[in-house]
Regions:
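The feature marks non-catalytic terminal segments
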Residues: 34-53, 61-67, 78-83, 112-203
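Active-site beta-strand->loop->alpha-helix modules in alpha/beta enzyme cores, enriched
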Residues: 1-114, 161
Length: 203
């Protein structure tokens, strides 16, 4: 199951990232196009899709940071409970405010549960900014145990198909990240196990 947390949108037209990259001025149309990309990527990986209707930051905060953090945390708790998953993979949260708040909320949600939890490095942000990876890991390490796992390569053909499913974003990311974006297709994935501070590594 691949869950997009911030998949909500307001009515009417909006000139944000989703509309700019899809070429669709109406927020609903732009986000439905993005959901179709989610589905294509998930099919390439043999996964199912799930969306939570909380708007991304591009549509305006609508609430204080603490209120938004709590709402996201509660939505993740509910999603984990209803899907009965045994493990959760969380973005490390490197640069984008949406990634960071989702990472923070997810860590709060899953560390209070019995679900096995992991963080992963978002590409190409991690390749382009390795210093941020180290700083973020140190920050997370102040609230939980963080244990590096062996890098994972996986099926590069399926990975390429999944990345290219996001046709509305690929060109923009390619221009913005250049060689670092090219590495998305070949670099191994990086993961860390996260555990409550008092939990033993064998649990």
């Amino acid at each position: 199951m691949i869950t997009t947390i911030l998949a909500g949108f307001p009515p009417g037209e909006h000139a944000g990232w989703s509309s700019q990259t899809t070429g669709l001025s109406v927020a609903e149309d732009a986000n439905l196009a993005r959901r179709e990309e989610d589905q294509r990527a998930s099919r390439a990986l043999g996964a199912r899709t799930n969306w939570i209707d909380i708007p991304a930051q591009e549509y305006g905060p609508g609430a204080s940071t603490s209120e938004r953090l709590l709402r996201i945390e509660q939505s993740i708790v509910a999603a984990v409970s209803t899907t009965e998953v045994r493990s959760v993979f969380i973005p490390l949260g490197l640069t984008h405010p949406d990634h960071i708040i989702v990472s923070d909320a997810a860590l709060r949600a899953v560390l209070a549960s019995d679900v096995e939890s992991y963080v992963y490095m978002e590409m190409p942000y991690g390749q382009a900014r390795p210093g941020r990876v180290r700083r973020r890991l140190r920050r997370i390490g102040r609230q939980c145990n963080v244990d590096p796992l062996e890098s994972f390569v996986g099926d590069l053909r399926r990975k390429s198909e999944a990345v290219n499913a996001y046709s509305s974003q690929v060109e923009t990311l390619q221009r913005g990240f250049g060689k670092y974006f090219d590495r998305v297709f070949t670099d191994p994935e990086r993961y860390w196990r996260v555990r409550p501070l008092l939990q033993s590594p064998n649990r």
